[in-house]
């Protein structure tokens, strides 16, 4: 999600929390954890903010197809769900609504909005589960997180 023009403090906070939940979820994607650990990381960051975690759309595995198993919900319980195995490639994509967790698809059958037409945010990275730790494949890795970067995009952390 990118803000267009000047945005107010409430929108900036929604964007910040959504992006932080992405990086915390990525950190949870380690060998030996489970898919539920990823959703639990999102929930832990969002808890107490008043934001709704969109549950009807999920992250997913990637491989021969764009959308593969496992589904990676943005809610979960630590230690639950399919195990995370070395070599898995996942799209992790937290989505939050400022005032609801409900969504609606418009008549074009593509555009998704929050059910109350309020603000929402979505951040996503594709990552690999490796024995060295979570490796972000699709963009730079911000400082302060225990993540590996792509050797191409982040030569210093790759």
Which residues are covered by each model-predicted region?
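Active-site neighborhoods and metal-handling regions in enzymes and metal-associated proteins
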Residues: 1-158
């Amino acid at each position: 999600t990118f803000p267009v023009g000047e945005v107010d403090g409430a929108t900036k906070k929604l964007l910040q929390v959504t992006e932080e939940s992405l990086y915390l979820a990525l950190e949870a994607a380690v060998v030996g954890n489970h898919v539920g650990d990823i959703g639990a990381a999102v929930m832990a960051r969002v808890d107490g903010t008043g934001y709704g975690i969109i549950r009807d759309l999920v992250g997913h595995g990637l491989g021969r197809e764009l959308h593969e198993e496992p589904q990676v919900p943005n809610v979960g319980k630590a230690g639950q769900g399919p195990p995370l195995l070395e070599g898995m490639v996942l799209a992790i994509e937290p989505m939050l609504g400022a005032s609801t967790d409900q969504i609606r698809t418009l008549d074009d059958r593509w555009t998704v909005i929050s059910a109350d037409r309020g603000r929402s945010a979505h951040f996503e990275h594709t990552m690999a589960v490796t024995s060295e730790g979570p490796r972000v494949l699709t963009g730079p890795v911000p400082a302060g997180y225990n993540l590996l970067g792509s050797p191409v995009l982040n030569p210093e952390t790759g």
